[in-house]
Amino acid sequence: MKQLPAATVRLLSSSQIITSVVSVVKELIENSLDAGATSVDVKLENYGFDKIEVRDNGEGIKAVDAPVMAMKYYTSKINSHEDLENLTTYGFRGEALGSICCIAEVLITTRTAADNFSTQYVLDGSGHILSQKPSHLGQGTTVTALRLFKNLPVRKQFYSTAKKCKDEIKKIQDLLMSFGILKPDLRIVFVHNKAVIWQKSRVSDHKMALMSVLGTAVMNNMESFQYHSEESQIYLSGFLPKCDADHSFTSLSTPERSFIFINSRPVHQKDILKLIRHHYNLKCLKESTRLYPVFFLKIDVPTADVDVNLTPDKSQVLLQNKESVLIALENLMTTCYGPLPSTNSYENNKTDVSAADIVLSKTAETDVLFNKVESSGKNYSNVDTSVIPFQNDMHNDESGKNTDDCLNHQISIGDFGYGHCSSEISNIDKNTKNAFQDISMSNVSWENSQTEYSKTCFISSVKHTQSENGNKDHIDESGENEEEAGLENSSEISADEWSRGNILKNSVGENIEPVKILVPEKSLPCKVSNNNYPIPEQMNLNEDSCNKKSNVIDNKSGKVTAYDLLSNRVIKKPMSASALFVQDHRPQFLIENPKTSLEDATLQIEELWKTLSEEEKLKYEEKATKDLERYNSQMKRAIEQESQMSLKDGRKKIKPTSAWNLAQKHKLKTSLSNQPKLDELLQSQIEKRRSQNIKMVQIPFSMKNLKINFKKQNKVDLEEKDEPCLIHNLRFPDAWLMTSKTEVMLLNPYRVEEALLFKRLLENHKLPAEPLEKPIMLTESLFNGSHYLDVLYKMTADDQRYSGSTYLSDPRLTANGFKIKLIPGVSITENYLEIEGMANCLPFYGVADLKEILNAILNRNAKEVYECRPRKVISYLEGEAVRLSRQLPMYLSKEDIQDIIYRMKHQFGNEIKECVHGRPFFHHLTYLPETT
């Protein structure tokens, strides 16, 4: 064996600590927070691989500590391992800066309150200082990492795809949001390629911080909580969704908005997340268990009970009193949402399968399936209630419970397709004892189904009957006594016996199989297996009808709308088989993948259509054939009704032949029938104008009186007007002598031209919008409300393009350099906007400037472009006006000066008398003496 070189050891250990861009940002932000920073700016270039800069206003690094500030295992946080029991800082290992130095080029600029100026240090791969120089930055520390992973080409290649780079940006934004919520008084700005991705200002408390991150609409559905356990010294606080909240705001398909903090440290704790999600889904989301609640949980425990030195990124911790924390959290959830309907404590959920809720729907977390549910007359497999911890029985239905009572029970039998759910529930309500007798496989689906046709049906716990007479068709009426006996024996069954799988028996004495793969029967060749919604009519089709190919045209080009307008009747156009398949599966696909665009979702579902078997495609081809027949019949009916209406007027009835020919004849007939009326109206107007007589009116007129009045008016005009008169220049480029009726003054023509240029740019200049690498999604949380989004939705838009996207064409947006795309959703309320292009000629131009434009439109009722220019654009246009005015010739002719004065008079009047710098156009010299 040989000892590895020191440089190799540093590189290997550093690549384990710094694994991505987000890990660099996390380490540097934690150092900033440990230094007491209240403002943090994070700037990235090329997704952080070219440059990462984190600037704060913390205490700074002392000059005596600078030589070892980036050396590994040098830290000011702790002195020995015993200090970990009282740890109050984020960092403690002293590895972050040293590890970053090994895989990037690092510059550190720092200044303390005692320093007169800041100092910039250039570090080498070992953390030693190569050079230093003074800097202009204020108090705090700025760490810049250049060329990340410069000596790890494989690691850099891993992030070469655009998707992985965008995922890193998303992770960094989520990290900054976590710290922004945890530290309400912390100001955060996140910039990528000079474009502001996300920012948060200082706020007063956690509620305002959550509102700035999640939005007002989400916080209106949240409620605060506090819980304190003196015995275990556990303190819980935060915000949870209300029981009656709008779950479209408080639920997500991913846990990215489930914030958990332990001792002010953002962590990932699966057990805590699972417990909260379990309570939330059972009490608030009975129709789905796949969603994650939006919540903020802050857990404070003694520092000695937490081990944070578990993973390199410190995102996971070990709790010494984990069970106490879970019990306290369960008590809190019970207080907020009430007790669970099936279990008494969280521990019962972890013991064995018998103590878990058996959920057999498309939204279940398990893959357990009931099998052998047939329609051949056999009853449902008998299950002993002694091993199922449910206290509900089937007698609840006898007391007049309606179908909604089924939703409170814990056994769910699939999703009933095409309206069978309601019929089956009604049968259960009427005949309790025969509830499971007539349920067939055609009424139960175990896979993902159509959202509009599916509903999860919950049925109460199943009784066990083992009658000696072998009756398999009915449940024994003496089930109550057997149930009591079964409950007494429930304590005798252990988890070990249950795991052997021989506890539950069916009516013939066979073991119940919890999982079984269902294979389609050969006698049903037309059965559709994609969504498992067999239609009864399809079950009786023979092989000839199944193999018969439809002549429906799948792809149609040139569609403008989905409807035809014929004879004042709106007729929906027929859809192809693939279009019907996309229409059925797109809502569920978008629910499971909310971040996928509508175009990408359609493409992925179309690819899924290509992989379907012929039997699965046959279902949609038959639907398409029926839809085409419906379309043709509606077309014929509409034309026949129109023909009958025309027959009453004495016109010949049109004999219907085909839908297309009749539509063409109808259009031709309509146009010809209106032509005589138009000719008659036009001819009558011409004849009317010809027949009108010219009226003659005599007015007394005198040329002498006209001349007298003209002279009087001319004299009055000369007295009222005080027109300036241009005399001559004074051999200076910016000094022209002018006089008015009362004074002599100097004119600076360049200032006037500067103001004229600025006014023209303000009204007409259009900033070019450059495409963004990553479009910015416009949400309510970004604008702190929905009022700004409502203004955008009301703006004009251009014609719809092939991609299905519409671009806002309002000049108040386009002239200010914003290209905003409106992407339609499943419904009108689910449309969303994103900034696809933005002007890059202004630094730090972004969403804040768009908000300034919308604020002018909303509050000042700005109609024109010049009324809603952001301050950055105004400053930019002022600079452009100055630049253009300085390009004018040094000496202007008298005609040019007169033209400038003329334009100044007609464009400004008496309103504007200064240039963009606030300097006047005219300089007063002297007043002229009055003449008598």
From Swiss-Prot:
* Any Gene Ontology CC annotation: MutLalpha complex
Q: GO annotations under biological process? A: mismatch repair; response to xenobiotic stimulus
Q: Name one Pfam family in it.
A: HMG_box
What are the entry keywords?
DNA damage, DNA repair, DNA-binding, Hereditary nonpolyposis colorectal cancer, Nucleus, Tumor suppressor
Enumerate the InterPro entries for this protein.
DNA_mismatch_repair_CS (IPR014762), DNA_mismatch_S5_2-like (IPR013507), HATPase_C_sf (IPR036890), HMG_box_dom (IPR009071), HMG_box_dom_sf (IPR036910), MutL/Mlh/PMS (IPR002099), MutL/Mlh/Pms-like (IPR038973), Ribosomal_Su5_D2-typ_SF (IPR020568)
UniProt key word Ribosomal protein: no
Tell me the compartments it is located in: Nucleus
Segments of this protein annotated with the region Disordered? 465-493
Residue ranges flagged as DNA-binding region: 571-639
The entry lists its GO molecular-function terms as: ATP binding; ATP hydrolysis activity; ATP-dependent DNA damage sensor activity; DNA binding; enzyme binding; mismatched DNA binding
* Annotated function: Probably involved in the repair of mismatches in DNA.
- Which family does the entry's similarity section mention? Belongs to the DNA mismatch repair MutL/HexB family.
Subunit info? Component of the DNA mismatch repair (MMR) complex composed at least of MSH2, MSH3, MSH6, PMS1 and MLH1. The MutL-beta complex is a heterodimer of PMS1 and MLH1. Interacts with MCM9.
Q: What is this protein called?
A: PMS1 protein homolog 1
Q: What species is given as this protein's source?
A: Homo sapiens (Human)
